[in-house]
Amino acid sequence: CFPKVKELVIRSYGGQKVKLTGTSKTLESVDVLLDDEDGSLECTVSAPKVKRVCINGKFAAKSKPLGKCFPNAKRLDITTANIQKVNVTGCKKLKQLQLTDTTQKAIGQINLSKNKKLKSVKITGKLRKTKIVISKKMNKKLVQKLKKTTKKAGAKLIKR
């Protein structure tokens, strides 16, 4: 569609469904802002050069894991009402992850076990009774930080 685009910014109003599809060999940055709670993002794009992804909105049921869409992303900032549908498996180079849950419901489970290169994780939301699954090979400083965060919030850290 736009063969030379490096930065993509989409802002949607009025409950629209946004679809990111196709393949991009030049895209490096993606920002999707859905202003209405009824809007959703269906992400099935293949964009291996993307390094930074910022998504504010709900994920559609047909979305692929973000690691399949953006396998080389180094930074993900996700703000959503359905955080349990955020799947970062496959983001091989992910170093920074920020997840923000916009509801007051319990999150459930977040699986970070495949993301061994993570150096920074920030999870905001109702973490009580949330299970955060991490890798045994994860950065030790990050594990210590996650232990403190999860303990304060009433979440459970599980090593795999």
Question: Where in the sequence are the language-model features?
Answer:
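Small-residue (G/S/T/A) turn/hinge positions that recur once per unit in extracellular repeat modules
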Residues: C1, S12, T23, L41, ...
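Low-complexity/repetitive intrinsically disordered segments
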Residues: C1-I10, I110
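Hydrophobic anchor residues at the C-terminal helix/turn of individual leucine-rich repeat
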Residues: F2, T21-S24, T44-A47, L66-F70, ...
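Conserved hydrophobic position(s) of the canonical leucine-rich repeat
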Residues: V5, G15, L27-V30, V50-R52, ...
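Feature marks extracellular polysaccharide-active and adherence modules
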Residues: R11, T21, L33-D35, N56, ...
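Leucine-rich solenoid repeat scaffolds
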Residues: Q16-L20, S24, I107-R160
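Canonical leucine-rich repeat
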Residues: V18-L20, L41-T44, V53, K62-P65, ...
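The feature captures the LRR N-terminal capping module
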Residues: D31-D36, C43-S46, V53, G57, ...
